[in-house]
């Protein structure tokens, strides 16, 4: 969650010795038998590098999707990240937005942004294909205020995203969509929901357009496994005691089409990085699939 002419998405693999758009990678490894996919709104990658590197070392996800990296491509911290052994794909801009995907295996294809001829999506959408599975990473606009043009832009962004799914994916084939959606879908996904009816991340129109996008063919795997569990992924900086009081929001999500959702075996929110020194206001969410 945030209030606030780009180059091609860059894909970097650690064994490459030269830049060529999408670089050559390490030799392929065997296909996954299980895939652990994580998402994290990092709220400035350069500021949270120690948190990201520590989490990669401890949790060893197969794929990590990052949002709000807040760094233009020319300043992306490749040197700090490549020793981790991950293939790194990113698309950013100065000071705002930005998405990246770190993966153990080289993506078979990389795509960025909408291709509908509309306005720039400001480094908010990145799609890769890994082991034949499309993985879409999104940082959805927050919307600012209900009466703001930014809120209408957010609603329209979801409409564009649903059409993007219709064009590029199939609900009958495995696919993952994850990221900071800036929507708390249910009353239990936000503290004191009655006080947030006009908040851009809980307003009725935002929830409706989000559910309409899901109805294309995605299922929230957290809700699938734990339909009655109240757990948050975001705690506002502006309320210093929000974490201790657990006054948060569940606005970061991992979703999958039916063929993959039914193979989801575990979903967890790791709250410890939110307790770290100089943390993001979000924390890591991860899911494991038997593939």
Task: Report residues per predicted region.
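N-terminal, active-site-proximal structural segment of metallo-dependent hydrolase catalytic domains
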Residues: 14-22, 26-86, 94, 99, ...
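Active-site-proximal beta-strand elements of phosphoester/diester hydrolases
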Residues: 35-44, 132-147, 178, 282
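Active-site beta-strand/loop signature of hydrolases that rely on acidic residues for catalysis
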Residues: 40-41, 56-74, 135, 164-187, ...
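Structured beta-strand-rich core segments of catalytic domains in phosphoester-bond hydrolases
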Residues: 69-72, 76-145
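Conserved beta strand-loop-helix elements of the APE1-like EEP
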Residues: 95-110, 229, 242-263, 289
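Surface-exposed cleft-lining segments at the edges of enzyme active sites
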Residues: 115-116, 141-158, 194-199
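Surface polyanion/phosphate-binding segment centered on an Asp-His-Pro turn
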Residues: 268-291
């Amino acid at each position: 969650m945030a209030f606030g002419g780009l180059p091609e998405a860059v894909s970097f693999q650690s064994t490459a010795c030269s830049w060529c758009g999408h670089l050559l990678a390490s030799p392929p490894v065997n296909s996954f038998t299980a895939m652990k996919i994580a998402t994290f709104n990092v709220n400035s990658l350069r500021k949270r590098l120690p948190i990201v590197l520590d989490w990669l070392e401890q949790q060893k996800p197969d794929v990590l999707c990052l949002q709000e990296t807040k760094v233009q491509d020319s300043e992306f911290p490749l040197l700090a990240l490549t020793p981790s052994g991950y293939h790194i794909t990113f698309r950013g801009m100065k000071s705002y937005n930005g998405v990246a995907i770190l993966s153990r295996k080289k993506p078979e294809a990389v795509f960025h942004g909408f291709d509908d001829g509309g306005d720039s999506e400001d480094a908010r959408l990145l799609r890769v294909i890994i082991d034949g599975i499309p993985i879409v990473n999104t940082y959805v606009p927050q919307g600012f205020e209900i009466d703001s043009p930014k809120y209408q832009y957010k609603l329209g962004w979801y409409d564009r995203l649903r059409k993007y799914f219709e064009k590029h994916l199939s609900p009958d084939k495995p696919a993952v969509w994850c990221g900071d959606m800036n929507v708390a879908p249910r009353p239990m996904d936000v503290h004191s929901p009655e006080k947030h009816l006009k908040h851009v991340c809980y307003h009725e129109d935002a929830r409706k357009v989000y559910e309409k996008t899901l109805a294309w063919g995605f299922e929230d795997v957290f809700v699938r496994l734990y339909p009655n569990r109240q757990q948050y992924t975001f705690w506002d900086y502006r309320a210093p005691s929000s974490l201790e009081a657990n006054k948060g929001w569940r606005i970061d999500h991992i979703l999958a089409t039916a063929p993959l959702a039914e193979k989801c075996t575990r979903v967890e929110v790791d709250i410890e990085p939110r307790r770290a020194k100089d943390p993001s206001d979000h924390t890591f969410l991860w899911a494991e699939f038997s593939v």
